[in-house]
Amino acid sequence: MKKNYEVMDGNTAAAYVSYAFTEVAAIFPITPSSPMAEYVDEWAAKGKKNIFDETVEVVEMQSEGGAAGTMHGSLAAGALTTTYTASQGLLLMIPNIYKVAGELLPGVFHVSARALSVHALSIFGDHSDVMACRQIGTAMLASSNPQEVMDLGAVAHLAAIKGSVPFIHFFDGFRTSHEIQKIETWDYDVLKSMIDMDAVDTFRKKALNPERPTTRGCTENPDIYFQRREAANQYYDKLPQIVECYMKQVSEATGRNYQLFNYYGAKDAEYVIIAMGSVTEAIRETIDHLTAQGEKVGLVAVHLYRPFSAKHFLAAVPATAKTIAVLDRTKEPGANGEPLYLDVKECFYGKENAPVIVGGRYGLGSNDTTPAQILAVYENLALPEPKNQFTLGIVDDVTFTSLPQKEEVAMGGEGMFEAKFYGLGADGTVGANKNSVKIIGDNTNKHCQAYFSYDSKKSGGFTCSHLRFGDAPIRSTYLVNTPNFVACHVQAYLHMY
């Protein structure tokens, strides 16, 4: 595949790849997913063609619930349909998602995962919203950075069509959705060559049509409801192999290795972290630091979360693993553990010489997760009795769940240039830095990364732009802590920060 690189964020990557497979887009805006729908709407208005040589039909509804209802109806009518959402918006879609999954319709929900309103509202990122959907019956595919959003977004659409199961393709709100990187984009002709047109034809033949009447959405009595519900098992049993097949095709086309569960680290690792989402990038960076010192550490990065294939997961974990930490970016009060932790525990249940497994929470509401915190996890795993149900990045002086805070360690490596720009919301600092990164990324061989931290106010609030440039791909999915350059555009900040 001819390589074409562009500077874009995760939302743009999701919009770009989803547009290729979409005939109808049902949209309603919600932070931080809104740019995905905005780009699709803009491209459709300009007449951009998908892989079927059609312009996407965009339908903006009155709410997320309406968008999900539109998606259900559109899929039932035989149109490949996509939507984009997050947080409370995803929760409003759940009643319709049950129908889409129950009827085995190949829709795709691209979700920039965001915190839910609990004790307080938060517009920032974690996995609280997508974890509320894990029992519905959709497949769930996780991406860790903008490049993975581009690549695995394609896998989500391709596998949904061939497997006849809807997908939730999710990535971390703000940390991935708004992080700008220089990434490789797809040629739509390559994507077209991958799609199973026989599966597309089968889907379209099942569309509601007065010439071929069928009964759907009816009431079933106890004599058949249970048995018909179990009939869907075959689709979910086949899905991991379908996803694996498309991941292999994407890997061959791009040169990047994608598996249901990607292992990274020492071959004989004794201490292993299981995680998904953007934190896996920071963990990889930390592993490089530790293995250079001879430490036996590793990571299993989860991509296909549902269906959770125990066979593929156990094959990815080194046989030498003594202690495992499972990191969840959500909190489930009252449960014996968080979702991913319980899935991992279940996989090892009854196995001989099973490793010790502990769980921890991190990153709720976009709380920053740094290499120092990852180092604390590995140090905890090396203890004779590692702490279970721990937290990272906070000081819990009430229930004492937090691991000890460690001093930050610079992980960027040689050739990395880091900069911080302090500004005021709507003063132009963020916009100028976005343009600077795109100019440098588009006109040099440098890899680039830009992330912008700010509060919930539209304008007049604190902003800080975190920019990195380097000769190698940048995996630092956390705020800049050791900048080479600092600019302060608000004089009052000199006395505040």
Model-derived features: where do they sit?
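Glycine-/acidic-rich phosphate or pyrophosphate-binding loops and their flanking alpha/beta elements
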Residues: 7-13, 248-271, 402-416
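Anionic-ligand anchoring segments at beta-strand to alpha-helix junctions in alpha/beta enzyme folds, i.e.
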Residues: 24-60, 267, 272-303, 415-482, ...
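A short, small-residue-rich loop immediately preceding and capping a beta-strand
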Residues: 24-27, 56-59, 74-92, 106-111, ...
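Conformationally flexible catalytic loops at phosphate/diphosphate-handling active centers
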Residues: 52-56, 167-262
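A structural-propensity feature for long, helix-poor, extended segments
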Residues: 62-64, 119-138, 310-332, 452-490
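Conserved thiamine diphosphate
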Residues: 123-173, 197, 346, 350-365
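Terminal amphipathic helices with adjacent charged low-complexity linkers/tails
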Residues: 172-213, 315-353, 358
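Peripheral docking tails and interdomain loops at the edges
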Residues: 323-412
